[in-house]
């Protein structure tokens, strides 16, 4: 957070000294001195990030646009969700009429927020990009189908959604089925990979948690460990 605060401070200082600070493509927003709170500064930066960008020209340099997009994402975890979503909506609306640019942003968003190797994984933020991308109707049919599937999976797995019914096979070979039970306090469904250290550690943590064990014993919580 300290380094990001210094970045924001540096942008303001540079703006005062030189009149503007750029990222190689366009002028970055100049955060007013009157905004001193870190969260508020992040909000301003995210909300006004593309104000000086000519998005019809920015995509001519894909490398620079990639760097600009990464810088755009960098402060989002520290900004308010409503500010972030409004900024994404506005940005995507300005890009929406150019199919190749939409596909470029779609690939960037997936690699930055959703892929296994993503440095900043956020289903909610990626879903916001996806919803805007799908609205454009500018994708090829294979990509449209791909992103529609991702969108459906993410929407259905958000907090508060009800998991679908499914059948499974127990370790002893017997069959079982999961059906949503509204009388349960909670249901935990863990998708695990046998022999995977992260899966094993997650199960051990649950087993070792006293409060969880008591909730399971009382029947208020059910835990399913499923190996797809």
Mark where each language-model region is:
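Surface-exposed alpha-helical segments enriched in charged/polar residues
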Residues: 93, 204-211
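Extracytoplasmic
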Residues: 161-163, 183-184, 218
